[in-house]
């Protein structure tokens, strides 16, 4: 994975809760849970599943989710 953001927090997905258009994704990063709101489409494109390794990517006022691959 190559990304310009410098703050990448590696963790495990502990919850993926889809709403009508937006999903809330919770990632456990060394005992601290980080929550991100992303589109349902992004969840599907990333194939996010509970137990999967993922990254909370923090840039300015945004938190994004990324995976290896």
Where are these regions (language model features)?
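Non-catalytic connector elements of ABC transporters
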Residues: 1-69
